[in-house]
């Protein structure tokens, strides 16, 4: 990592202190997603943080699937998560499944029972919630709290054998029902769920709860720094309690950092699933989605996402990042790498009446005006071209420097043309415009006889490729996913997707899915991997060319 990427953050400082004090010889971090959905940009922040810390300090970073809830998890999500981590540029040291530790967790639960630190409770879920109390009122002890060790061992074993129905019994830690930390009020550590598991099949019908499983998983793997988001700060004392009372040999340290919030972006996995289930988007990889799969399909590069995650830093307090900051980093990346091309997404035919019929010529246009070494490409030019419909106005306002009757503009890399006639259909719609060109004004000849204020792009109507262009706006209208109690579906932007049919220059004839282009005056585009076929070229606009956003 460069010095910029080594910018200080409190987690990095903790690790440095731990290594300097010889508390640890090496560090081991982990990324522990639950395989119940697709990863989003918030997960990417955690991936980048954990893997970059492991890399910087010559440590290790594991990928662990926290698969303790069989009813919501699927191998589809396991595979997509593995793909996303690899795509972001990281290789895990070890791959683990929490479910592979179920035997060990069961043994540790038995240990808690034998120590008088856990009991089987028959209260209903509603009663457990009622007995727990509130933040201002202490909880009440369960009438089953003082069962004997022998009875608890017997009941827990029978729970494992499948003798009881779902929800009829749970195993709870025996801690303190009057604790000011509500997480300490005898939390559930095992529940009954007669459900087939994607990894263990039907071996188990009892499953550990997150607060019990997670610290044990970290300890089993020898994780030194267990990095999670702020909502788990109140759970840290419970995390430490389970590590201690389960007598784990390794003692990991939980550290919390602020989760990522982005303007105009839903970050809740539940809400993202709702968008998919209700058909508001066309899947988890819809280019409007903040999922890693969606960003990839939109055209974001791994480098741009990594640089974004590094730039936002690591904080102890929640804040919201401007979505334009993410756009800044993809522009920065593609500015250097994306080939240029001209495309017309809302075409209007322009006929050059004094250009020889049936003839054409080859023009050379620079690939990158800011980089001479990028060279030039050949583009054909003939009597008929397409221009953008918005580049012509019959009755323009002041300071409109594009094409209108009697005005002259430069066609990018070609000639000056002057509008002489407007052709309309029976409804008064402009269908084509007729112009004359000045052969003396060819680009690159050094012509200085007169100047024009407008330059517009075009494609040769006789040598271009039909294409579909998908233009995106934020899916969510408000700055936050929740605003003054509104339901987030009320904030869906009805104009989040606009589909245009147009043309692109022939240099794109060999474009393949995920190829990226800078289309002159339009922005950066990615060839869509889902909808593109041999006879249908589809481009997703990643971002426009410019933004008012400034990186501080």
Swiss-Prot record:
Gene3D superfamilies (UniProt xref): Glutamyl-trna Synthetase, Domain 2, Glutamyl-tRNA Synthetase, Domain 3, HUPs, Ribosomal Protein L25, Chain P
SUPFAM superfamilies: Nucleotidylyl transferase, Ribosomal protein L25-like
Sequence motif 'HIGH' region, location on chain: 33-43
Catalytic activity reported: tRNA(Gln) + L-glutamine + ATP = L-glutaminyl-tRNA(Gln) + AMP + diphosphate
InterPro entries: aa-tRNA-synth_I_CS, Gln-tRNA-synth, Gln/Glu-tRNA_Ligase, Gln_tRNA_ligase_bac, Glu/Gln-tRNA-synth, Glu/Gln-tRNA-synth_Ib_cat-dom, Glu/Gln-tRNA-synth_Ib_codon-bd, Glu_tRNA_lig_a-bdl
A Pfam family it matches: tRNA-synt_1c
Keyword Cytoplasm: yes
GO cellular component terms, semicolon-separated: cytosol
GO function terms (MF aspect): ATP binding; glutamine-tRNA ligase activity
Motif 'KMSKS' region boundaries: 266-270
Main enzyme class: ligase
Disulfide bonds: none
Keywords: Aminoacyl-tRNA synthetase, ATP-binding, Cytoplasm, Ligase, Nucleotide-binding, Protein biosynthesis
EC number: 6.1.1.18
Any one Gene Ontology BP term: glutamyl-tRNA aminoacylation
Keyword Lipoprotein recorded: no
Chain positions recorded as ATP binding sites: 34-36, 40-46, 229, 259-260, 267-269
Protein location: Cytoplasm
PANTHER family in UniProt: GLUTAMATE--TRNA LIGASE, GLUTAMINE-TRNA LIGASE
Oligomeric form and interacting partners: Monomer.
Family: Belongs to the class-I aminoacyl-tRNA synthetase family.
Cited HAMAP family: Gln_tRNA_synth
Descriptive protein name: Glutamine--tRNA ligase
Annotated source species: Clostridium perfringens (strain ATCC 13124 / DSM 756 / JCM 1290 / NCIMB 6125 / NCTC 8237 / Type A)
Gene: glnS
């Amino acid at each position: 990592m460069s010095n910029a990427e080594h910018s200080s953050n409190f987690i990095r400082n903790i690790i440095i202190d731990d290594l300097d004090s010889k508390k640890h010889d090496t560090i081991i971090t982990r990324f522990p997603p639950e395989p119940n959905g697709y990863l989003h940009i918030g997960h990417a922040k955690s991936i980048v943080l954990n893997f970059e810390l492991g890399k910087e300090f010559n440590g290790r970073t594991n990928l662990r699937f926290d698969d303790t809830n069989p009813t919501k998890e699927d191998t589809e999500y396991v595979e997509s998560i593995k793909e996303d981590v690899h795509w972001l540029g990281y290789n895990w040291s070890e791959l683990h499944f929490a479910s592979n530790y179920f035997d060990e967790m069961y043994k540790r639960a038995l240990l808690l029972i034998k120590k008088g630190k856990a009991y089987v409770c028959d209260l209903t879920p509603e009663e457990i919630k009622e007995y727990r109390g509130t933040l201002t009122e202490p909880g009440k002890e369960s009438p089953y709290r003082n069962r004997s060790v022998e009875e608890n061992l017997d009941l827990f074993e029978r729970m494992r054998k499948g003798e009881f129905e779902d929800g009829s019994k749970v195993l709870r830690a025996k801690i303190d029902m009057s604790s000011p930390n509500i997480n300490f009020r005898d939390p559930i550590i095992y529940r009954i769920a007669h459900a087939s598991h994607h990894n263990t099949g039907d071996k188990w019908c009892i499953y550990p709860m997150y607060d019990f499983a997670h610290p044990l998983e970290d300890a089993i793997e020898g994780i030194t720094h267990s990095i999670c988001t702020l909502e788990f700060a109140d759970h840290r004392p419970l995390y430490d309690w389970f590590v201690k009372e389960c007598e784990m040999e390794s003692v990991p340290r939980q550290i919390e950092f602020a989760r990522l919030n982005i303007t105009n972006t839903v970050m809740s996995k539940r809400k993202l699933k709702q968008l998919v289930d209700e058909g508001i988007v066309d899947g988890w990889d819809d280019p409007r989605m903040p999922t890693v799969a969606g960003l990839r399909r939109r055209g974001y590069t791994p480098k741009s996402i990594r640089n974004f995650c590094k730039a936002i830093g690591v904080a102890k307090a929640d804040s919201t990042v401007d979505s334009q900051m993410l756009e800044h980093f993809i522009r920065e990346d593609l500015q250097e790498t994306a080939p240029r091309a001209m495309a017309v997404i809302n075409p209007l035919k322009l006929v050059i009446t004094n250009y020889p019929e049936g003839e054409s010529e080859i023009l050379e246009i620079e690939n990158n005006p800011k980089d001479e070494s990028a060279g030039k490409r050949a583009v054909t030019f003939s009597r008929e071209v397409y221009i953008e419909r918005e580049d012509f106005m019959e009755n323009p306002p002041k300071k409109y420097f594009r094409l209108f009757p009697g005005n002259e503009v430069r066609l990018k890399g070609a000639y000056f043309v002057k509008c002489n006639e407007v052709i309309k259909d029976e409804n008064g719609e402009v269908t084509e415009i007729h112009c004359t060109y000045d052969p003396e004004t060819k680009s690159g000849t050094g012509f200085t006889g007169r100047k024009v204020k407008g330059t517009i792009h075009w494609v040769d109507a006789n040598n271009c490729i039909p294409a579909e262009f998908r233009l995106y706006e934020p899916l969510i209208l408000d700055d936050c996913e929740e605003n003054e109690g509104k339901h987030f579906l009320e904030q869906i932007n009805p104009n989040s997707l606009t589909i245009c049919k147009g043309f692109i220059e022939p240099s794109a004839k060999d474009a393949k899915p995920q190829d990226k282009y800078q289309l002159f005056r339009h922005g950066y585009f990615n060839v869509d991997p889902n909808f593109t076929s041999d006879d249908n070229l589809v481009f997703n606009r990643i971002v426009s060319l410019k933004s008012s956003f400034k990186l501080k």
